[in-house]
Amino acid sequence: MNKKKRVLTGDRPTGKLHLGHWVGSIKNRLDLQNNPAYDCFFIIADLHTLTTRVRKEQVVDVDNHIYEVLADWLSVGIDPNKSSIYLQSAIPEIYELHLLFSMLISVNRIMGIPSLKEMAKNASIEEGGLSLGLMGYPVLQSADILLAKAQLVPVGKDNEAHIELTRDIARNFNRLYGEIFPEPETLQGELTSLVGIDGQGKMSKSANNAIYLSDDDATIEDKVRRMYTDPNRIHASTPGRVEGNPLFIYHDIFNPNKEEVEEFKTRYRQGCIKDVEIKTRLAEELIRFLQPFREKRAELLAHPKILQEALQKGTENMCALAKETMEEVHNTLELSRKWRSRLSL
């Protein structure tokens, strides 16, 4: 019988999750979780949060954000009985493996990763102000992946370079000390991102262009009403552009009535329909889609013990796996092995 392939993915706890997370990662995670060929590990990467959020009030907020992420995950169907959900900072071995891996990769190699500068820009970090922690973010990510001996990592195109770095680190370690780590492969879903409601790049909290999984009906209606469409379409009788229009991107994803969507597109191109009619239907479909998630989320937040137990169970699973991996690393590396055995600590 073939052994299950181990999958690792997760989120930084920076707040509530939004439709961009659903489209870019969560839907794919559910498919993987419910496929018997995969063994899924989902990491709440709180240490990664510190790479761009180091102020005291930001660090204090992480605790609450962990509850937010947990509630969102479980409300959409992530199942702690099928997958291991764990807290990154609760795994001591991650710190050690991160340090060891940092000896195996050059600064030039790290600085060649395109997304690093983008992260600094999004965090309003000026050039030259990059912290050692942020610069080492991709190495910490490699430690997450290889500590779990993950074989598959679902990522967007902007993170493919991170996985290539992880493969480089695995190859370097295996060549120098012995074969321990698999070289993980990337796994991409049909869609890796969702344009924000302002039409200016992908949906994100920092851009203030997100519809959250927990938004109430009135908030959804308001955000859809303000959604960016074709700027050249001043009147309903003006033929509009469908391609690249956020309004139709969302309809294609969230409106199950494909005949209706195609009719909207035809009438829009002909200048025979008002934006408000299309937006009203989109709001209705988003409300229908998100309502069960929102209700389940509220129930979970009202019973935090369920969230705690889910995280406890998964973190214990990851702790056991981490200990096994690091025992292999210590035996292979033979770092001060004789002295370590003599010390009674």
Swiss-Prot record:
Residue window of motif 'KMSKS' region: 202-206
Presence of the UniProt keyword Nucleotide-binding in the record: yes
Keywords: Aminoacyl-tRNA synthetase, ATP-binding, Cytoplasm, Ligase, Nucleotide-binding, Protein biosynthesis
GO molecular function list: ATP binding; tryptophan-tRNA ligase activity
SUPFAM superfamilies on file: Nucleotidylyl transferase
GO biological process per UniProt: tryptophanyl-tRNA aminoacylation
Motif 'HIGH' region per UniProt: ranges: 13-21
Binding-site residues, ATP: 12-14, 20-21, 156-158, 194, 202-206
Root EC class: ligase
E.C. number(s) listed in UniProt: 6.1.1.2
Glycosyltransferase keyword on record: no
Localization (cell): Cytoplasm
GO cellular component terms attached to this protein's record: cytosol
Catalytic reaction(s) noted: tRNA(Trp) + L-tryptophan + ATP = L-tryptophyl-tRNA(Trp) + AMP + diphosphate + H(+)
Subunit structure: Homodimer.
HAMAP family on file: Trp_tRNA_synth_B
Annotated family: Belongs to the class-I aminoacyl-tRNA synthetase family.
Function according to Swiss-Prot or TrEMBL: Catalyzes the attachment of tryptophan to tRNA(Trp).
Protein name, entry field: Tryptophan--tRNA ligase
Lineage: Bacteria, Pseudomonadati, Chlamydiota, Chlamydiia, Chlamydiales
Gene: trpS
